[in-house]
Amino acid sequence: MNILNLKIIMFLLISNTIVVGGAWATSTCPDWPATRIAVEINALEQQLNKWSAAYHQQGHSPVTDDIYDQLQDKLRVWQSCRGLPDKTESQPIPGKGQFLHPVAHSGLKKLKDETALTRWMAGRKNLWVQPKVDGVAVTLVYHGGKLVQLLSRGNGVKGQNWTEKAPFISAIPQYIANAPALLTLQGELFLLMDGHQQAKSGGVNARSTVAGALMRKSPSPLLAQVGVFIWAWPDGPTTMKEKVALLQVMGFPFTAKYSEPVMSHLDVVQWRQFWFQAPLPFVTDGVVVRQEEEPAGRYWQATPGQWSMAWKYPPLQHIAEVKDIHFTLGRTGKGTVVLEVLPIKIDDKWIRRVNIGSVTRWKQWDIAPGDHITLALAGHGIPRLDNVVWRVHQRNTITAPNWDKFHQLSCFQRLPHGCEPQFLSRLIWLSGPGGLDIGGIGGGFWQELIHHELINDLVGWLLLTPEQIASIPGIGNARAEKIYQQFQRAKQQPFSRWLLALGFPQVVSVDAQWQVVLRRSLSEWATMAGIGQMRAKQIKHFLDHPDVQALADFLSTQKVVGFELTE
């Protein structure tokens, strides 16, 4: 047995796609030389900066927030592997703006989970929670009550001047009576929604829609559908209660309606879940917890402050890192590619392997170890590859095995050379629910039989004695006797199940006999309901194959139902 076949066989034995329960560490250091990890850190950092610039300068990004945040977490892991400090939160936002903000946009640091939230809230008082509105961050500047500037966030220090668009956004007051002589507000321009439920509908591309309307040279009719949520009033009233009350009087009602005092992390958990499910007038992607006490505006910087934190909703898209690529040969001789990924948890399932189909499809995806992919759960909880979101800079060449000689009628025996993977797949199918459904018999057991040369063809296990089965390490006499009895009872399985277990390409009636099936002509098969000419040819090729006929002859000697000779 060559090394490639051994790897394929061992992979088949452990190829449970989803593992429920338990946990594996996903934040591990890659097994790369120091020079390579430095290159990969630099490449990922540059890409994240480009996406960040697009997000803050243009209001949209080629990747979702979920993807960006998870790749940023990966960058942190890689940096820690080299002993580098975490600069992801303190790094200035890339890009340039022309107009200076009176007060810098500080941004938000993201809390990882409830434990991090509890830790941050400890020792702090006068805390409030708000929905994290998903829109375009702006600064509103009023002089003597008159709106004089509407600036995009830009890089947090300077932004673009959108003041000419403000008159078309009815949610923005153009004049505020009794306003402070100089009033600076920071907030979010968002797309007004009618009962949007984040848990059901997701982000619906709302932020990009607003950004596109703001960046058009001519005013867009869409601006009439834009609302504003004020989340910061630098150098404003010292209490949140007074802030939201005055904001409502000035014409900004959403802040008062969606700001709630909280005493513990459980209050935040409750509001986060409520807003995730409740119908809201805007798209959200989490909650923001902020304390009343803030530094004076002149001390704000374009990096996350410590007086407010974001706790985002669980990601809709999940990133997995490809650890290895395996090529498996199925019972019909078709090769498939399975990606081994660093384990990730989606819902309540741990994912560590993803079947992506044929070698051709794998080549189209251009996936190599180290790449990062997005996964989702399809029907029956089976993981599905959605996209490749990040490709490593250094790509190791992987050559797929040549499986041209394998087909639907190859490898009913362990030999000739190279047949082990397909033969094992045939045995796994035979004992599985699609075949004879022999309980407790799977790939590990069949591989032990092959390894100890106790089985050479697809039905040779019927000849095994309890003593032979018990000779396999780890199988005692009691279990060996149980397996032996299971094998003997399998002889009484319906004929149709036996045919399927052997690989017959069509279900037949239970009362059929092997010799009856064998005597049918090609034209007779073709005229049967649901078969047709192509399937009829497959059936005849199967029935006429000498290996299949040899199996049938053996089953006849074992008095297996349907295979007995009739006079």
From Swiss-Prot:
Its EC number is 6.5.1.2. InterPro entries: DNA_ligase_B, DNAligase_adenylation, DNAligase_N, NA-bd_OB-fold, NAD_dep_DNA_ligaseB, NAD_DNA_ligase_OB, RuvA_2-like. It is an enzyme of class 6 (ligase). It catalyses: NAD(+) + (deoxyribonucleotide)n-3'-hydroxyl + 5'-phospho-(deoxyribonucleotide)m = (deoxyribonucleotide)n+m + AMP + beta-nicotinamide D-nucleotide. Signal peptide: none annotated. Keywords: DNA damage, DNA repair, DNA replication, Ligase, NAD. GO terms for molecular function: DNA ligase (NAD+) activity. One of its GO terms (biological process) is DNA replication. The active site is at 132 (n6-amp-lysine intermediate). The keyword Ligase applies. It holds the Pfam family DNA_ligase_aden. Belongs to the NAD-dependent DNA ligase family. LigB subfamily. Catalyzes the formation of phosphodiester linkages between 5'-phosphoryl and 3'-hydroxyl groups in double-stranded DNA using NAD as a coenzyme and as the energy source for the reaction. PANTHER family: DNA LIGASE (PTHR47810), DNA LIGASE B (PTHR47810:SF1). This is DNA ligase B. The gene is ligB.
